[in-house]
């Protein structure tokens, strides 16, 4: 990787910064699934996590480094504070990767120095080169971030960056940590760094930003014009508070407006060479995967991947699009992998046809998972005459991409009507395989189901979000249910799809409860381990 590439490096931090969204916590297997999808998408760098943060994060980074960080694959990055313990832990987790990167950071704004770090500027100027050099002793590829660079004194920032590069940093990342800057300010910040850091040509300038004012993508594009060559982003823009810059928006902006951005990368205006390595046809699929696994629904009017991104309500617009798509569409839906809602299978379709179509859609399933998905497909096909690609996607997401089952739904029955009190009966299979049954009355059928499940499971929680949407059109369409539960200060999400919305609601609730229960059990195990360690 040259220090000044003539293309844009895409650094995906969905598994690190994106996972910090409330309720977006993923287990190790889910993180690996996302990492594989990011590799297929073509991202250059995957920030897999923060190895020092927890044993679970360490194991996830290590597994991703081993399975996804192979020769010819993406660089695998681990985050570390500017301490030797953090950096050593990151290096250990990244050992299996063919192209490991350690990303270390230290705040440089006066407010962070005074209130968080309680350090002087001189101390920071000494710590940064020492820690970058320490990281360099483990890996060749080191990234340094001056946290809250957007609110740092520019002259001090230049000194910090110069010392970081001199100590071996190959990438210097400029974060707008609180999403405060405007595009012109961000562009000036990058230009100032290009002009005032003497050794800046020895490192790639990266940018990282949050969307608190809705300006993250605009800021990044302005940064590209002023010399930034790496963009740190997340799928669907997920992340803390208002989120991060959205990968799909950045990539498609650079793709659609290539002629505009070509000169800023030293290319002829009419160059047709892509500005990124991203396979854009994988964008929609990856967006759906992340949405399903995190339980964070994509808003319908979200640019690029929202349900309405290629929909036209106005009669004038519809007429124009039918005559020529370019009248009201600046990109083709197929360019992001959004295929027509084509009918492909039915109840007479066999396992081979089912398996073949899933492979065409990009799903690589093990024999066990394929069998599970096929049984579910047959179940849906008996109730739904025509099975579309979107139905197949929903089936795979619902059947395979779920939290490990501690509780399993065996039966749900409801009785309701305008003259009857909604009543639900549920039968679950518990952690030891025991049958658990109960019934409850609610204000509606879903409320009754959830109350019955709560009586059986007995895990305290608060339902804070419940949403339903149709997968496809038609009266027999599958419905997708996404819910979010709150337990103490943590949020857990669940997702399920079914032609029966009550069944989908029950399965989504069980999915979220399984995540919650697993987290409680893990906390118990860690406390017991800590108690044993302290006793010995």
From Swiss-Prot:
UniProt domain Pyruvate carboxyltransferase: residue ranges: 8-269
One Pfam family, short name: HMGL-like
Cited SMART domains: LeuA_dimer
Residues engaged in binding Mn(2+): 17, 208, 210, 244
Claim: Metal-binding is one of the keywords in the record: yes
Pathway connected to this protein: Amino-acid biosynthesis; L-leucine biosynthesis; L-leucine from 3-methyl-2-oxobutanoate: step 1/4
Reported cofactor(s): Mn(2+)
Assembly, per entry: Homodimer.
Protein name: 2-isopropylmalate synthase
Organism: Gloeothece citriformis (strain PCC 7424) (Cyanothece sp. (strain PCC 7424))
The encoding gene: leuA
């Amino acid at each position: 990787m040259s220090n000044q590439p003539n293309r844009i490096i895409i650094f995906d931090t969905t598994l690190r910064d994106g996972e910090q969204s409330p309720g977006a916590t993923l287990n190790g297997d889910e993180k690996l699934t996302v990492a594989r999808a990011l590799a297929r998408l073509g991202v250059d760098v995957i920030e897999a996590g923060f190895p020092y943060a927890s044993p679970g994060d360490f194991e996830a980074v290590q597994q991703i480094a081993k399975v996804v960080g192979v020769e010819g694959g993406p660089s695998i990055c681990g985050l570390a504070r500017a301490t030797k313990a953090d950096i050593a832990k990151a290096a250990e987790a990244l050992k299996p990767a063919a192209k490991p990167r350690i990303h270390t950071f230290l705040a440089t704004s006066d407010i962070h120095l005074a209130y968080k770090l309680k350090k002087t500027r001189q101390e920071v100027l000494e710590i940064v080169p020492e820690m970058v050099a320490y990281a360099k002793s483990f890996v060749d590829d080191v990234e340094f971030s001056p946290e809250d660079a957007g609110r740092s004194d520019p002259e001090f920032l230049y000194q910090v960056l110069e010392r970081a590069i001199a100590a071996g940093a190959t990438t210097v990342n400029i974060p707008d940590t609180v999403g405060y800057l405007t595009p012109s300010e961000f562009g000036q910040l990058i230009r100032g760094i290009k002009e005032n850091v003497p050794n800046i040509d020895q490192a790639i300038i990266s940018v990282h930003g949050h969307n608190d004012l809705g300006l993250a993508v605009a800021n990044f594009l302005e940064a590209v014009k002023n010399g930034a060559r790496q963009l740190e982003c997340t799928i669907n823009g997920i992340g803390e508070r208002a989120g991060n810059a959205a990968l799909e928006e950045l990539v498609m902006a650079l793709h659609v407006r290539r002629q505009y951005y070509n000169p800023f990368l030293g290319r002829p205006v009419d160059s047709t060479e892509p500005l990124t390595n991203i396979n854009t046809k994988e964008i929609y699929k990856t967006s759906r995967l992340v949405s399903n696994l995190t339980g964070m629904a994509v808003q319908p009017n979200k640019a690029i991947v929202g349900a309405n991104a290629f929909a036209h309500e106005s009669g004038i617009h519809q007429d124009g699009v039918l005559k020529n798509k370019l009248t009201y569409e600046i990109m083709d839906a197929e360019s992001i992998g959004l295929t027509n809602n084509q009918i492909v299978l039915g109840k007479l379709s066999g396992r081979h046809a089912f398996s073949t179509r899933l492979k065409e859609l990009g799903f690589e399933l093990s024999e066990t998972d394929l069998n599970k998905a096929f049984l579910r497909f047959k179940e849906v096909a008996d109730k739904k005459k025509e099975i579309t690609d979107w139905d197949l996607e929903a089936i795979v997401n619902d059947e395979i991409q779920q939290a490990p089952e501690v509780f399993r739904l065996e039966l749900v029955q409801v009785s309701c009507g305008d003259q009857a009190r909604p009543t639900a009966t549920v039968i679950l299979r518990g952690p030891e395989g025991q049958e658990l049954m109960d019934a409850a009355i609610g204000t509606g059928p879903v409320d009754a189901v959830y109350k019955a499940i709560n009586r059986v499971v007995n895990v305290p929680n608060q339902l804070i979000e419940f949403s339903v949407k149709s997968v496809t059109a038609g009266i027999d369409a599958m419905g997708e249910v996404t819910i979010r539960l709150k337990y103490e200060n943590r949020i857990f999400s669940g997702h399920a799809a079914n032609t029966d919305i009550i069944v989908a609601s029950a399965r989504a609730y069980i999915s979220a409860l399984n995540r919650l229960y697993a987290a409680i059990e893990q906390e118990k195990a860690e406390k017991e381990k800590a108690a044993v360690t302290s006793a010995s």
